[in-house]
Regions:
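Alpha-helical transmembrane segments in multi-pass membrane proteins
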Residues: 2-53, 73
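Aromatic-anchored segments of alpha-helical transmembrane domains
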Residues: 16-24, 81-90, 143-152, 185-196
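Structural signal for the C-terminal ends of transmembrane alpha-helices
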Residues: 24, 48-57, 90-91, 170-173
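Membrane-interface helix termini and inter-helical loops of multi-pass transporters
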Residues: 26-28, 57-63, 89-101, 201-208
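Short, aromatic-rich membrane-interface segments at the entry and exit
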Residues: 29-39, 97-102, 154-161
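Function-critical hydrophobic alpha-helical transmembrane segments in multi-pass membrane proteins
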Residues: 90, 95-148
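Functionally important transmembrane alpha-helices
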Residues: 157-210
Length: 210
C-alpha cells in the first residue's frame, strides 16, 4: 500500500472515531457542546500540523484561485436552499421575528462550519476519491456517513446527507474551504431555526447558566 493510501485510511479512521465519539457524547452523555469544542481543537491542531507540508494548503482548499467559482456555486446553493428553509419555517410559524440567537449563529457558526467542511470535504471527500478512484462513489459514501452522524434525528440526518452530497461535489471540483465554511455555517444556522425549530445555543447557555 502506498504512503498516500496509508495516510488516506489513517485520516478516514480519525474521522470515523470523531463521528462515533460525537454520537456517544451527544446521545448518551448529553455533552454535545464540550465535545464540539474539543473536536474543533483537535482538528484545528491536525490541520496546522499537516499544513507544514509543501502544497498541502492548496490541496485542502486554502487557496484563492478557486474562490470566485466556489463563491458563485455556493452562492446559488445558499440563495435557493436558504429561501426554501426560511419559507418553510415561516409557513410553520417559526423565526418570525428572527430570534436573537440566529444573528449569533450566523456570526459564529462559520468557524465550526469551516472545521466540518475541512473534515467532510478535504479529509473525507478527497481521501474517499483517492481510495475509490471515483468522485461519484466518494460523494455517495461521504454523504451517507455525514448523515448517519446526526442520527437518531432523521430530519437532520436527511438534511445533512443532501447538503453533504452537494458540498462535496462542489468542493471536489472547486476546492475552497473559506467559501464552504461560510456556506455551511449560514445554511446550518437557518436549518436549525427555520426547519428544525431548535436553538443549538440553548445547551451552551444552560451549561453556563446564561
Amino acid at each position: 500500500m502506498s504512503r498516500v493510501k496509508r495516510r488516506a485510511w489513517l485520516e478516514l479512521g480519525l474521522v470515523l472515531a470523531t463521528a462515533v465519539l460525537h454520537f456517544v457524547f451527544q446521545t448518551a452523555l448529553h455533552l454535545d457542546a464540550p465535545y464540539i469544542a474539543a473536536a474543533v481543537l483537535f482538528w484545528t491542531g491536525y490541520l496546522v500540523y499537516r499544513l507544514r507540508a509543501a502544497g498541502q494548503a492548496r490541496a485542502w482548499g486554502l487557496r484563492s484561485d478557486t474562490f470566485a467559482a466556489s463563491l458563485k456555486a455556493n452562492g446559488v446553493l445558499l440563495l435557493v436552499a436558504g429561501a426554501a428553509m426560511v419559507g418553510y419555517g415561516l409557513s410553520r410559524g417559526r423565526g418570525c421575528p428572527p430570534p436573537h440567537s440566529l444573528y449569533l449563529l450566523l456570526a459564529l457558526y462559520p468557524v465550526w462550519g469551516l472545521i466540518q467542511q475541512f473534515i467532510i470535504c478535504a479529509i473525507v471527500g478527497q481521501n474517499l476519491q483517492s481510495v475509490f478512484g471515483s468522485r461519484i462513489r466518494a460523494v455517495a459514501v461521504g454523504a451517507a456517513l455525514f448523515g448517519a452522524v446526526h442520527l437518531p434525528n432523521w430530519t437532520l440526518c436527511m438534511l445533512t446527507a443532501i447538503a453533504c452530497a452537494i458540498w462535496m461535489s462542489l468542493f471536489l471540483r472547486w476546492p475552497n474551504l473559506w467559501v464552504h465554511g461560510f456556506s455551511h455555517g449560514w445554511l446550518a444556522s437557518l436549518a436549525y431555526i427555520y426547519v428544525l425549530g431548535e436553538d443549538p445555543l440553548a445547551a451552551v447557555r444552560q451549561m453556563f447558566n446564561v
